[in-house]
Amino acid sequence: MRTAILKGAVDQGFFQYQGSLNHDALPAARNISLFFKVHDAELAFQPGWPHVSKVNGEVFVEESGVRILASKGQLLDTKVKDVYVNIPHAPAGKDSHLLITGGFAGGLGDGLKILQDAPIGTGSTFAGWKGEGDLQGKLDLDIPLAKGTEPKIVVDFKTDKARLQLAEPTLDLTQLKGDFRFDSAKGLSGQNISAKAFDRPITAQILADGKPGSLSTRVIAKGQVTVKRLTDWLKISQPLPVSGDIPYQLQVTLDGADSQLMVSSTMKGVAVDLPAPFGMPASQGRDSVFRMTLQGAERRYWFSYGELASFTFAAPADKFNDGRGELFLGNGDAVLPAAKGLRIRGVLSELDIDPWKKLVDRYAGNDPGGSAKQLLSGADFKVGKLTGFGTQFDQVTLQLDRKPTAWGLQLDSQQAKGTVNLPDAKGAPIAINLQYVKLPAVDPTVQADENAPDPLADIDPKEIPALDIAINQLFQGPDLVGAWSLKIRPTAKGLAFNNLDLGLKGMQLKGAGGWEGAPGASSSWYRGRLDGKNIADVL
């Protein structure tokens, strides 16, 4: 009583003693009771809990325990009414309990402050949450007065036109309405919930899946969000080949170190501007799921895009580029690597390089720090049919590995096998070293069409980078043409071919050449020597 009742004015009171006056009388032979009628009292139920002030009520101290009947009071800025406080007498060897029931009407912010600050084990779960708006409900508290025992708390409340700001992940809910319950033995639950998120209406329910000492809350929401609004929320500034409205089901699990966010969507209404087979019109749809953890020094990320792609990643909080992960293209599962960087693997039936090159130029061409290249650690692909630069390769294996100052590409296919060295230095030549290149045989039954379109007509020679090319064996059908080597260098007008050394079935073409002009209106030239040994072998 001395610590619980901090102040107050007593309107009236009485002391009652009933029983034996004998000194050696049994305790059961006596009955002592006190009564106070108070106003403007301030009560402190337990350390760590906010005080209840402006209390008007009655206090009964009896053999059975202590009772307080408060008609009204104030907890923070919340009005409380019809509060019944009971501290029943505890038998020998048992702990005393403080039992409180009552109603309240106030603000959502007060409710969050109690969840954050009161000694009930919910501070970390609701840390950083903010709220405003009307809140009304009732509470039922069972607070042990002995140290080391957790209180039992059940609070039922309603909100209407409230605003709730979650801290992790950062999410702003407005026009929040619903029926909620907080149970300290399970967690937060709710039903009939509606709100606005990402400027769109949503419906939601909250499930309490925890147990005493281990609270767990799941928030399940359904709604729609524009791609632009979602990328802003995720703080993605890089343009993406995605547009439209995303229908989603969002699930946030608040479970301490196991807290995570999951977003699933049919993607119906979303247009994906990617080359086949990954692109799709807005009318098609493709089941996709994104998950991420919300706690811990290292955050985990997962994403699945139908049966076409799977992604997993782990990175320190707020340091995505220091992470490690894998993107698997095709029907398979990504595996988290131990080394830093993003690894790409895949098994694809077809891949056309040209549209992917245009896509990279469009969306990554303005990457000032080259962050995508810095993050990539390697790639390993198997492609049934690879098309690019006017050529088709079959049964292709591609491996991309990081070197100190360059990327190393290994190519193995039916038509070509070798390595490509892609230097970091801008303008440095790309080194192409091929063991063999197999060109299709000329069909003698097919007559050349002089009016056939030029396959190089649409190529701008000024866009071709510096290249050092060496081919050990060049075949045309089953016939060996010879070894080829040359150096290609960009010029103001187009390209220069230097150090030409081309084997042509017994002849050797050496010298220099050039290719200049605009697409469709270009010209080429050559200056050099043509040598041969035995003319019979050549013919």
Named regions from a protein language model:
Residues 22, 239-241, 254, 277-283, ...:
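Extended terminal
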Residues 62-64, 183-184, 255, 295, ...:
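Structural motif
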Residues 17-25, 141-147, 333:
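Outer-membrane beta-barrel proteins
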Residues 50-53, 116-121, 171-175, 210, ...:
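Flexible, surface-exposed loop regions and adjacent strand-edge segments
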Residues 360-373, 446-456:
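Long, charged amphipathic helices and adjacent flexible linkers at domain junctions
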Residues 59:
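Anion-recognition interface
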Residues 1-16, 30-42, 65, 79-140, ...:
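Small-residue helix/turn framework positions
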Residues 66-67, 188:
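Extracellular beta-strand scaffolds
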